[in-house]
Swiss-Prot record:
Organism: Saccharomyces cerevisiae (strain ATCC 204508 / S288c) (Baker's yeast)
Protein name: Dol-P-Man:Man(5)GlcNAc(2)-PP-Dol alpha-1,3-mannosyltransferase
Keyword terms of this UniProt record: Endoplasmic reticulum, Glycosyltransferase, Membrane, Transferase, Transmembrane, Transmembrane helix
UniProt membrane topology term: Multi-pass membrane protein
GO cellular component, one term: endoplasmic reticulum
Major location (coarse): endoplasmic reticulum
Amino acid sequence: MEGEQSPQGEKSLQRKQFVRPPLDLWQDLKDGVRYVIFDCRANLIVMPLLILFESMLCKIIIKKVAYTEIDYKAYMEQIEMIQLDGMLDYSQVSGGTGPLVYPAGHVLIYKMMYWLTEGMDHVERGQVFFRYLYLLTLALQMACYYLLHLPPWCVVLACLSKRLHSIYVLRLFNDCFTTLFMVVTVLGAIVASRCHQRPKLKKSLALVISATYSMAVSIKMNALLYFPAMMISLFILNDANVILTLLDLVAMIAWQVAVAVPFLRSFPQQYLHCAFNFGRKFMYQWSINWQMMDEEAFNDKRFHLALLISHLIALTTLFVTRYPRILPDLWSSLCHPLRKNAVLNANPAKTIPFVLIASNFIGVLFSRSLHYQFLSWYHWTLPILIFWSGMPFFVGPIWYVLHEWCWNSYPPNSQASTLLLALNTVLLLLLALTQLSGSVALAKSHLRTTSSMEKKLN
């Protein structure tokens, strides 16, 4: 017919119409820079380079900067009392910095460190080991960043802390091991939250992260800051089945018992009192977060109670806004424990990472005391929190630099404490605002969907 062209003619016409775009090196350079800074796909390039850079940097630090003795000698003295002297009464185990106050997982790990470093004879071996521990933790946390689609400019922040490097390779604190197991736990939870079509794998991963979480707690109790969010996450992963969730809790308790068997058999009361002493007092002079107060107010039980109440209010607000149906789902599961319950509007892939990471940050904000090594508890989550808070590219790094200054300010002082409190409060408020706006949008979307379905039915 007239006006029609054959396919061959159309292809020929397309070839004739193609015009190669002009070469614009400046625009290409800008696009490349924009890609490397803002596009999460660039993390496949950025992350390996950062890990390589960190590996070399840690080597240089170990070689050029003198080891700083703070707690490692005390760890070794305590292990000697347990391993060489056969002391199993926790209340009698002590070192240069005081009594043993960590659970049996700490003892298990530092027995290995005692063998590696031969007590205090070869601390340099311990530094090398902690270098690998740092790099492993960094690689795992970057896996979390990749799954959560963080832009590269946020990822880079994970490698910029002077204080964190010293905590690992210059001081050999036990906090580093707890952080490793918590990163593994959160990574496992993120992966499990995406296993919508593989329920058996999801529940198996829930059991695995219960074990790794318990391992973290058995090294140092700061991992308990994750506990409320951990139970909610397991509840969601188990499709709101309270029995399966309780079985995961039993798995946590089982590890605590297994790792502490020698002490529980001999002196159970002393072990539980020393390893899980929630009333332990912290030294005011080394607490970097409340130096704007005097020592008397810092040690006041009313202040501790106010922090606890504020902590609980913040956690409750977090859970209710992120998972509004938590109470109805829990009640339904209690009424029908053997039935598979639908977790409505929970959105596991977003809810689980958010409640885990945000609840830990809330716990840090309302902690009675933060010593310098405690930075490792939450530093690895800062790139995620900054990204979630919606901070612009030019604001996030400024916040981070100020935050790092607070942790490097020595000795602890009121100016750094006040600024740290302000920075962390602002970050939490920004998280709350973005979360609230997201919840409102989700509720409106759900309402529109429900109304549309009702109209179709009518």
